[in-house]
């Protein structure tokens, strides 16, 4: 009886098929994780808005931001780093203030390369200061809450804060909302 062995070609074909299947699984897994992080970002925004509204109900206004030091972005409060001081004034309304699931920078803050920059941002605009009114026309102050980047499809996130023809935070952030007082 003659023993049958696998030929080199047969072994290479099996290895190639395993490689293709592994790649397909990894791509699917990576895409699923990205979608989950985007969903988490939206859920976090909802959580933060609820906490901000509770703060406003108690104090009569939204909190002023605490610019994030040398990591700040144009006086915005951002969640970069460990997020320990991000929106610390919400501590009595949240067990822990959410931060972006990736929460990282790709070098200096450059929102033109947002595909590698992930953070949450908050800014309070005082309507009595014409520099910060941005043509919004609100009779009172307002706040903007945002996150920089979605990982899957930014077009599905329709929340883009705009005021008149002057201010469009959608140019800086994939998701942004205005909270008028």
Where are the language model's segments positioned?
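Alpha-helical interaction segments
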Residues: 18-19, 45, 52, 83, ...
